[in-house]
C-alpha cells in the first residue's frame, strides 16, 4: 500500500470529463443556500460504468453526516439506492433530497444502460462554516474522479486508506454492509481514524495539486488537521504544473487545432 501518485494534471478543467467520457461534470452558478451546483452527464455504456454493469457492481455506498444532497434528473433514467431501497428517477420526478446519514449511491437505471443520464446535483450543510468541518465539494469530486481514473484505466492499485482519506476530507464516509452494527459509527471511525489520522501519518493526502482547481482552499482544509497540514504546500501546484508541462501543452495545441 502507498499513497497515490497522480498520472495526469486536470486542475482547472471545466467541464471535468473522466473514464473515456463516461462522466462529465461542470460548475453552474450556485443558489445562495447551496454549497455547489454541478451539471452532470453520465454515460453508463462507457468506461468505468460499463465495467461495473458487466460485473453487476455499483459505485460505493456512502453517507454524509451533516450534508443534505439534492438530485434532479434532466434527461434519462437515474437510480438512487436510498437506505437499501432503489428509487428510480426521471425528469418528471423533480428534485430528490437525501438527508444526512442516509446510506446512498447513484447509478444509471438498470435496463437503460445505453441512455445518457443528464442531472444536476447540489448540497447544503449547516455545519459548513464550523471550524474543522469537512464538506463534499468540488475538490472532493476532482480528486475522487482523478484517483478512480488512475486506478481503473492506468493501472494504479486501489488503496483503501487513500479512499478513506479522500472521502473523509469531502465530508463523505463509506457505508459498511447493512448487517454491521452501528454501521454509521463504524464508517465514521474508519474515515477519521484510519483515513485522516493514520493515513496522514503514513503520507496519504486527501487532495493532490494535479487534480485540484482551488488548491488554496484545499490547503486551508488540510491545515485544519494536525495529521494533514504537512501536505498544505501552496507552491505544490506550480511544481506539478511544471512536471506535466508537456501534457498541458499537447492538450492546449489539440484544443487550438479544433477551434480553427
Swiss-Prot record:
EC number: 1.-.-.-
BP terms from Gene Ontology: terpenoid biosynthetic process
Molecular function per GO: oxidoreductase activity
This protein's UniProt keywords: Oxidoreductase
Pathway per the UniProt entry: Secondary metabolite biosynthesis; terpenoid biosynthesis
Miscellaneous field: The macrophorins cluster contains a single gene insertion (encoding for the terpene cyclase macJ) compared with the yanuthone cluster that produces the linear compound yanuthone.
Known function: Oxidoreductase; part of the gene cluster that mediates the biosynthesis of macrophorins, isoprenoid epoxycyclohexenones containing cyclized drimane moieties. The first step of the pathway is the synthesis of 6-methylsalicylic acid (6-MSA) by the polyketide synthase macA. 6-MSA is then converted to m-cresol by the decarboxylase macB. The cytochrome P450 monooxygenase macC then catalyzes the oxidation of m-cresol to toluquinol.
Sequence similarity: Belongs to the oxidoreductase OpS7 family.
Protein name (Swiss-Prot/TrEMBL): Oxidoreductase macE
Native species: Penicillium terrestre
